[in-house]
Structures are given as structure tokens and as C-alpha cells.
Amino acid sequence: MIKSERPQAYIGRFAPSPSGDLHFGSLITAIGSYLQARACQGKWLIRIDDIDPPREVPGAASRILHALEHYGLHWDGEILYQSQRHEAYCHVLNQLQQQGLSYYCTCTRQRIHQINGFYDRNCRELNLPIDHAAIRFKQRHPVYGFEDKLQGYLNADPVMAEEDFIIHRRDGLFAYNLVVVIDDDYQGVTEVVRGVDLIEPTVRQIALYRQLNLKIPDYIHLPLALNKDGNKLSKQNHAQPIPLDDPRPLLIEALSFLNQSVIENWQDLSRDQLLQKATAHWDLDRIPRQGKIHIDNMNKVTVSHNNHSQKIHSRL
């Protein structure tokens, strides 16, 4: 079992990508990470994960920040933009290369798909040139599971855990698994609160933390909001942006989804009073491991919960 060490001061974060506006699913993650930080009397930071320009929607970053403020989720310190962190990412890439922990790979997605979806280290010992190549992390000490403060101990598919994963894409963009580790360490994040759809890459990120001799944060993976078809609410699935009218009803819906105690007269409180009450009553143990929420529109939300444990098994 991998245990993390963290300093006394709590630092959490919310790191949306500007590929679309804030929707109800991302609001749940924002509220969960915000309340966990405030209940721990810690800081709550905002980072804009804008490392993939082709997927960015113009103006989305500023609209996300405006929506967070509208819902009373005020952050601490300055906003960090990943697009301004390329020098730091290159430094770590060079460090891994000098340590013999990375290599160039020219394998296509089609080839990997033909061999059951997992990379077989085909290019590991070929010493390929940089031309038209991705950079892969050379796994020497794979991580096969980790402790999640909500989900419990999660086991990874051994084949996935041992895979040499991409840390720099052939199109010149930095990979998520690399930059999230570098930036969470840079910001001093002590606990990562995010959705269960990001459970699988966690073991890869922990492997990087260990190889770079960085402190591993604690992890909390929250249940996902689903649409009426059972699909995750996401920008790719055209989830509707959260409305910018009275924030209280949707705040209460998000708290209900997280199975928090919602006192009947909370709807009579102001937005800030509501968040203060939510912080005072915040109970991590009440959050379901899995949740299901059916949304036909922003005025009709039905929540159900399922507390069965889960394992890392799907391929992202």
C-alpha cells in the first residue's frame, strides 16, 4: 500500500479545462473540492488546464471563472494557467531523459489498438530519433493500487499499471499525466479531489511522483453525474452550462447529490450563508462511492446512490 506524506497546511484545488463552460457535473467536483478545503481550514486553488489548444473553446476559461464566482466559490491566491508552464514541463522532461526514464516512440494509435489497446514497449530499446515521435515514461516501479479516502483501496489492472505511458505527444503537446503531477507539486497540493473518471490515471501519476521524489497527495474521487442515458455529464456530451440566475437551488442539488445534510430552511439563506452552513456540516463519510443523477434540464434533477466498491478496470 502506498501512503502519502503531507504537510500540516491543507491545500486543495479545482483544475477545469477550458474545453467548454462549467456544467453540473463539474460544479459537483468544484463544490466537493471547495468544501473539503474549507472544512479542513485550508486553501482552495484554481488552475486552468489549458494544455490542449485544439480542444479549447474561446472565452471558456473566463466564463468558468465567472460561474465559480457567481456560485460563491471564491479561490485563494492567483490562478495558474498551464499554458504558461511550458518551461517547467520541459525541465522535467529533460530530467527524465537524463535519468534514462523516457524514450521516443513512433507507434500509432491504430497499431496499439490492434494489440488489444495496451502499449507493448515496442520502441523501448530502439533509440529512435525525435522526429514525429511521442515521448513515453519508462516504467521501472509500477504502482498497482492506491488508497482513496472515499473509495478505499483501489487495485489497478496490472497490464495498465505496467504500461509505458505517453508524457509528451507527437504533436508537441504535453500529456495530462505529466503536467498534473508537476503542477500539483508546484502548487503544494496536499489532497486531490476530482471525479471517479480520473481514478485510472492516478497510479500512473503516483509512479511519476515516486520517480521524481515528490510528495504524493491524498486522493478523493467523487461520484459522477450522469445524464438520462447513463452517460457522464461532460462537455464532449454537450452538457448544458449551469445557469447564472439564483445559484442556491443548484447548490442544494449538488449538496444532495453528495448526500450532505440539507436543512429545510437552507433555501431561505443567502448564497454565502448556504455555503457557510454546508462547510460546517460537511461530512466526507456521507458521500456515496457511486452516484447516479438523471438530468432532463436544469430544473429537473433526480438523484440516486449506489455504495458498491469499485476497481480500476476500464481503459481511458
Swiss-Prot record:
<keyword id="KW-0547">Nucleotide-binding</keyword>
<dbReference type="GO" id="GO:0004818">
    <property type="term" value="F:glutamate-tRNA ligase activity"/>
</dbReference>
<dbReference type="GO" id="GO:0008270">
    <property type="term" value="F:zinc ion binding"/>
</dbReference>
<keyword id="KW-0067">ATP-binding</keyword>
<dbReference type="GO" id="GO:0006400">
    <property type="term" value="P:tRNA modification"/>
</dbReference>
<feature type="binding site">
    <location>
        <position position="49"/>
    </location>
    <ligand>
        <name>L-glutamate</name>
    </ligand>
</feature>
<dbReference type="GO" id="GO:0006424">
    <property type="term" value="P:glutamyl-tRNA aminoacylation"/>
</dbReference>
<keyword id="KW-0862">Zinc</keyword>
<feature type="short sequence motif" description="'KMSKS' region">
    <location>
        <begin position="232"/>
        <end position="236"/>
    </location>
</feature>
<dbReference type="InterPro" id="IPR022380">
    <property type="entry name" value="Glu-Q_tRNA(Asp)_Synthase"/>
</dbReference>
<feature type="binding site">
    <location>
        <position position="235"/>
    </location>
    <ligand>
        <name>ATP</name>
    </ligand>
</feature>
<dbReference type="InterPro" id="IPR000924">
    <property type="entry name" value="Glu/Gln-tRNA-synth"/>
</dbReference>
<feature type="binding site">
    <location>
        <position position="176"/>
    </location>
    <ligand>
        <name>L-glutamate</name>
    </ligand>
</feature>
<feature type="binding site">
    <location>
        <position position="107"/>
    </location>
    <ligand>
        <name>Zn(2+)</name>
    </ligand>
</feature>
<comment type="function">
    <text>Catalyzes the tRNA-independent activation of glutamate in presence of ATP and the subsequent transfer of glutamate onto a tRNA(Asp). Glutamate is transferred on the 2-amino-5-(4,5-dihydroxy-2-cyclopenten-1-yl) moiety of the queuosine in the wobble position of the QUC anticodon.</text>
</comment>
<keyword id="KW-0479">Metal-binding</keyword>
<feature type="binding site">
    <location>
        <position position="119"/>
    </location>
    <ligand>
        <name>Zn(2+)</name>
    </ligand>
</feature>
<dbReference type="InterPro" id="IPR020058">
    <property type="entry name" value="Glu/Gln-tRNA-synth_Ib_cat-dom"/>
</dbReference>
<feature type="binding site">
    <location>
        <position position="123"/>
    </location>
    <ligand>
        <name>Zn(2+)</name>
    </ligand>
</feature>
<keyword id="KW-0436">Ligase</keyword>
<feature type="binding site">
    <location>
        <begin position="13"/>
        <end position="17"/>
    </location>
    <ligand>
        <name>L-glutamate</name>
    </ligand>
</feature>
<comment type="similarity">
    <text>Belongs to the class-I aminoacyl-tRNA synthetase family. GluQ subfamily.</text>
</comment>
<feature type="binding site">
    <location>
        <position position="105"/>
    </location>
    <ligand>
        <name>Zn(2+)</name>
    </ligand>
</feature>
<dbReference type="Pfam" id="PF00749">
    <property type="entry name" value="tRNA-synt_1c"/>
</dbReference>
<dbReference type="InterPro" id="IPR014729">
    <property type="entry name" value="Rossmann-like_a/b/a_fold"/>
</dbReference>
<feature type="binding site">
    <location>
        <position position="194"/>
    </location>
    <ligand>
        <name>L-glutamate</name>
    </ligand>
</feature>
<dbReference type="InterPro" id="IPR049940">
    <property type="entry name" value="GluQ/Sye"/>
</dbReference>
<dbReference type="GO" id="GO:0005829">
    <property type="term" value="C:cytosol"/>
</dbReference>
<feature type="short sequence motif" description="'HIGH' region">
    <location>
        <begin position="16"/>
        <end position="26"/>
    </location>
</feature>
<keyword id="KW-0030">Aminoacyl-tRNA synthetase</keyword>
<protein>
    <recommendedName>
        <fullName>Glutamyl-Q tRNA(Asp) synthetase</fullName>
        <ecNumber>6.1.1.-</ecNumber>
    </recommendedName>
</protein>
<dbReference type="GO" id="GO:0005524">
    <property type="term" value="F:ATP binding"/>
</dbReference>
